[in-house]
Swiss-Prot record:
InterPro entries: NRAMP_fam (IPR001046). HAMAP family: NRAMP. One of its GO terms (cellular component) is plasma membrane. One of its GO terms (biological process) is iron ion transmembrane transport. Probable metal transporter. Signal peptide: none annotated. It is a multi-pass membrane protein. Belongs to the NRAMP (TC 2.A.55) family. This is Metal transporter Nramp3. The gene is NRAMP3. It comes from Oryza sativa subsp. japonica (Rice). Residues 1-26, 536-550 have a biased composition (Polar residues). It comes from the Eukaryota. GO terms for molecular function: cadmium ion transmembrane transporter activity; manganese ion transmembrane transporter activity.
């Protein structure tokens, strides 16, 4: 529908034509885009509408089966068998709830998480949150760099450090995507990742893990042995990534959702269903990888070569786990799937970086320049580590990158929980008490396990580093001061009151009445115009509308 909106009992749509006719204010699109293939949600109630919402959840779920997840899953299974499966279960459930909140924030307010942060926090706080978000994007890109380098090593015997340099060429691939569209490559990626997932599931049948041990690992929390806590944190960081919250809240802005209470609730429900389906697939893939790794490496019939691989398992050695299914082709096919996984994650990481920069700083870069910047920052540590320590050290860098993501998660999660629990931002679409308790419990658990690991690891480092007493004292002072700053920053975000009202726009109104107030309050900074042209103008994979299925 185009033209001026009129009051009606029917749900109202806000078209891009109307948006372009507005004055250049906060709601003006960053890109004067023109012909954008919009995804329009029909007004009629139908389960076919679900097909119109499919897309964002699957793009986000790519991060749950990236090389970082492969690496942490393989090491978790090889070192602790099925002991850490419960982390995957909890992380997957937490991810579903948290990602659904991110989608809801975008649908209800018409603004994504980074934009809300810019509107809500002082300049200094906003700048720090932007730096942390950018570091999260870079930390997420490190596994993609190393995973791609490992894949090139398996395919062409290229040294890992050379492969790290070659990964910069993925920028050229992104350029091609911008020119020819994403659909065909995403379809190819889906086939390759599905193929490797199928192989692990079939291998699961060959390896025959002890079902009672698997069930125990899923439902009985345990953290035994040295390094279990650190690996659990890396698993958590690999599953619930801070950049995904920014990404998901922005991707949903590409849909033309009915601006009515019912239309918004339906959109939130369908986005949750789509996310649940996508994350269930990712959950099964992660569970199968850990179980295969645990069953194979825990076997008593391993050859000396396989025993050596299991003792220092990383992505570069993991193909032997698939020999029962693929034989001599295991290495090549695993490398191709690893390459596909790394490149697909690079694409979503690039978009996440764009949304972060646009939201926090009101700046926008050409995608290939944005990709080149992020990739350059990720290549530097990967190159140094791969040259000095080889593939084993590069694999450990993936674990460290995942741990960094876990430590940074509260700085994206707390603002999300605060915003979605705020009636002045979400109106009647705020989180229920049950959801609030669950999500704040998840956030508290993450902070507690991160703090516990920091303290125990730092104390061990102080006691066994061989430094003089004076050096230990000063190291302890600075180390614990850093931990106090970390905790204080989180507490600041938790207890700071929201000060900006960003309300949903309903039924064509420019103002929304807050429950319990006598006057209409203008939704400050609320865009309310979906689809957002600065979002939908990006050449993301487009889905058929529900009307196309009739």
């Amino acid at each position: 529908m185009s033209g001026p909106m009129q009051r009606s009992s029917q749900p109202q749509f806000i078209s891009s034509v109307e948006r372009n006719n507005q004055s250049n204010g906060p709601g003006t699109p960053l890109i004067d885009s023109i012909d954008v293939d919009q995804i329009v949600i029909p007004e009629k109630n139908s389960w076919k509408n679900l097909f119109s919402y499919i897309g964002p959840g699957f793009l986000v779920s790519i991060a749950y089966i990236d090389p970082g997840n492969f690496e942490t899953d393989l090491q978790a299974g090889a070192q602790y068998k099925y002991e850490l499966l419960w982390i995957i279960l909890i992380a997957s459930c937490a991810a579903l709830i948290i990602q659904s909140l991110a989608a809801r924030l975008g649908v209800v307010t018409g603004k994504h998480l980074a934009e809300h942060c810019r509107a809500e926090y002082p300049k200094a706080t906003n700048f720090i949150l932007w730096i942390l978000a950018e570091l999260a994007v870079v930390a997420c890109d490190i596994p993609e760099v190393i995973g791609t380098a490992f894949a090139l090593n398996m395919l062409f015997k290229i040294p890992v450090w050379c492969g790290v340099l070659i990964t910069g060429l993925s920028t050229l691939m992104l350029l091609l995507l911008q020119q020819y569209g994403v659909r065909k490559l995403e379809f190819l990626i889906a086939i390759l990742v599905s193929l490797i997932a199928t192989c692990f599931l079939v291998e699961l049948g060959y390896s025959k893990p002890n079902s009672s041990e698997v069930v125990r690992g899923l439902f009985v929390p345990e953290l035994k042995g040295n390094g279990a806590t650190g690996l659990a944190i890396s698993l958590l960081g690999a599953m619930v990534m801070p950049h995904n919250l920014f990404l998901h809240s922005a991707l949903v802005l590409s849909r033309k959702v009915p601006r009515s209470v019912h239309g918004i609730k339906e959109a939130c429900r369908f986005y949750m269903i789509e996310s649940a389906f996508a994350l269930t697939i990712a959950f099964l893939i992660n569970i199968s990888i850990i179980s295969v790794s645990g069953a194979v490496c825990g076997s008593d019939n391993l050859s000396p070569e396989d025993q050596m691989n299991c003792s220092d398992l990383d992505l570069n050695k993991a193909s032997f786990l698939l020999k029962n299914v693929l034989g001599n082709w295991s290495s090549k096919l695993f490398a191709v799937a690893l390459l596909a996984s790394g490149q697909s994650s690079t694409i979503t990481g690039t978009y996440a970086g764009q949304y972060v920069m646009q939201g926090f700083l009101d700046l926008r870069m050409t995608p290939w320049i944005r990709n080149l910047l992020t990739r350059s920052l990720a290549i530097l540590p990967s190159l140094i580590v791969s040259i000095i320590g080889g593939s084993s050290a590069a694999g450990q860098l993936i674990i460290i990158a995942s741990m960094i993501l876990s430590f940074e998660l509260p700085f994206a999660l707390v603002p999300l929980l605060k915003f979605t629990s705020s009636r002045t931002k979400m109106g009647q679409h705020t989180n229920s008490k049950a959801i609030s308790v669950i999500t704040w419990g998840i956030g508290s658990f993450i902070v507690v396990i991160n703090t516990y690991f920091l303290i125990t690891s730092f104390v061990k480092l102080l006691l066994h580093n061989g430094l003089s007493t004076v050096s230990q004292v000063f190291s302890g002072i600075f180390g614990f001061l850093g931990m106090l700053i970390y905790m204080a920053a989180i507490l600041y975000l938790v207890f700071r009151k929201n000060r900006k009202a960003t309300l949903p726009l309903l039924e064509g109104d420019s103002t929304v009445r807050i429950v319990g107030r006598d006057t209409a309050t203008e939704g400050e900074g609320s865009l309310g115009h979906l689809p957002r042209e600065d979002i939908s103008s990006m050449q993301l994979p487009q889905q058929r509308t529900a009307s196309d299925l009739d």
